[in-house]
Amino acid sequence: MANHKSAEKRIRQTIKRTERNRFYKTKIKNIIKAVREAVAVNDVAKAQERLKIANKELHKFVSKGILKKNTASRKVSRLNASVKKIALA
C-alpha cells in the first residue's frame, strides 16, 4: 500500500474518478443502446424520441467536459443516420 500521505490521497482520488467515469460511460452506452434498440425494431417514433434525448444528453456531457465536442457530434451523427434510414424506408 501507500507509504506517503500524498500517495494515499492519490489512491482516494483515483477511486473517486474511476467511479465517476464508470457512471458516465455506462450512461452514454445506455443512451446509445436505447436508440439502436428502437432502430432495430423499426419503431420510427420511439427512435426519433430517443434520438432527441440522446442528442440533448450527449451535448450536456460536452458542456460538463466529459466528452469532447467532436466525439459527441460523431455519435449523434451516426445515430441520426440510422434513424433517418429507417424513417425513409
UniProtKB/Swiss-Prot annotation:
Matching InterPro entries: Ribosomal_bS20, Ribosomal_bS20_sf
Entry GO terms, CC: cytosol; small ribosomal subunit
Pfam families according to UniProt: Ribosomal_S20p
Keyword annotations: Ribonucleoprotein, Ribosomal protein, RNA-binding, rRNA-binding
GO MF terms held by the record: small ribosomal subunit rRNA binding; structural constituent of ribosome
GO BP of this protein: translation
Signal sequence extent: none
Record-stated family: Belongs to the bacterial ribosomal protein bS20 family.
The protein's role, per its UniProt record: Binds directly to 16S ribosomal RNA.
Protein name stated in the entry: Small ribosomal subunit protein bS20
Source organism per UniProt: Helicobacter pylori (strain ATCC 700392 / 26695) (Campylobacter pylori)
Gene for this chain: rpsT
